Amino acid sequence: MTNLRKSHPLIKIINHSFIDLPTPSNISTWWNFGSLLGVCLILQIITGLFLAMHYTADTTTAFSSVTHICRDVNYGWLIRHAHANGASMFFIFLYFHIGRGIYYGSYTFMETWNIGVILSFAVMATAFMGYVLPWGQMSFWGATVITNLLSAIPYIGPSLVEWIWGGFSVDKATLTRFFAFHFVLPFIITAMVMIHLLFLHETGSNNPSGLNSDSDKIPFHPYYTIKDILGLLFMLMTLMMLILFSPDLLGDPDNYTPANPLNTPPHIKPEWYFLFAYAILRSIPNKLGGVLALVFSILILMLFPALHMSKQRTMTFRPLSQCLLWVLVANLIILTWIGGQPVEYPFITIGQLASISYFCIILILMPTTSLMENKLLKW
């Protein structure tokens, strides 16, 4: 009699994905972030579901309903802060996951990579709409500023903005549709994650050496299940410390003021995980130019397979490219800092320089460095 996990049509799929999956024996902790992102997604869906049971998507009661969740619902404060800080953890892991893909040349798995980029867009859209739901000052003005950017699209822009708003300003209709989209998108993301994994398992995982590892594979369980559980414990510990000790550390105090269309906050800024893109948007004085730069700052990830000039897949044995990648990381940290600063000298200039260097490093310096390394190795 064959083993049930190998013969049952449904369990067989799980077995081939998480138990008997042949995995390279040398993948490092950088490969843990995929599973951590999966855990974050499940956590967000569960906490979000419980929040949706008590939340009302109406401009008059939205802010009060969030207050009610925190004050009156059993462990509502915990669920709310787990959801808000869970989003921050999600983005930390997402950026690490993308960074690992760039460092180790995982973008050569074209389908997996491109679906991953689309996934990151979907996650960003979901997070943006979620930020609007508490209907605080930053929720309202953030929604107004970001949706207004679509008016920069030639000819159809202004009509498109009013169509998204459901009126002539961000109001009840906007909040209702944002709640609907925020609720449904995570399930679409889950389906896309499955496609992401499907394509990954077609090729098998990459590894730190970048070499073919078919001759040296080990089963996923128990080796990597244990390794993933360790990562999960670290994640839960960090998340619980954040929730229980300083739940508002990453939030904006302005969002504790109910939305008021007649009073603009002095500094409108998104959540910390969007600040780098926001800094790029603000660094261009032209509205359409800024919007294009904003979109392209993420869409540029799709160009990585085309910009790969090295004869080696990973950066493991390429010190010059490694240095350049860490310069890019430092650049992104500077952009994140600038995004949270007011629009005045010297922040404007720093933001413009950091934005130019962001695109220059990816489009010019990284490919030329790769070609130079090929020459140095006489390839």
From Swiss-Prot:
Alphabetized UniProt keyword annotations: Electron transport, Heme, Iron, Membrane, Metal-binding, Mitochondrion, Mitochondrion inner membrane, Respiratory chain, Transmembrane, Transmembrane helix, Transport, Ubiquinone
Gene Ontology molecular function, alphabetical: metal ion binding; ubiquinol-cytochrome-c reductase activity
Cofactor: heme b
Coiled coil feature spans: none
Compartments, as annotated in UniProt: Mitochondrion inner membrane
Binding site for a ubiquinone: H201
PROSITE patterns linked: CYTB_CTER (PS51003), CYTB_NTER (PS51002)
Binding site for heme b b566: H97, H196
Topology relative to the membrane: Multi-pass membrane protein
Similarity comment text for this entry: Belongs to the cytochrome b family.
Assembly description: The cytochrome bc1 complex contains 11 subunits: 3 respiratory subunits (MT-CYB, CYC1 and UQCRFS1), 2 core proteins (UQCRC1 and UQCRC2) and 6 low-molecular weight proteins (UQCRH/QCR6, UQCRB/QCR7, UQCRQ/QCR8, UQCR10/QCR9, UQCR11/QCR10 and a cleavage product of UQCRFS1). This cytochrome bc1 complex then forms a dimer.
Other remarks in the entry: Heme 1 (or BL or b562) is low-potential and absorbs at about 562 nm, and heme 2 (or BH or b566) is high-potential and absorbs at about 566 nm.
Identification of the protein by name: Cytochrome b
Gene source species: Proechimys guyannensis
Lineage of the species this protein comes from: Eukaryota, Metazoa, Chordata, Craniata, Vertebrata
Gene: MT-CYB
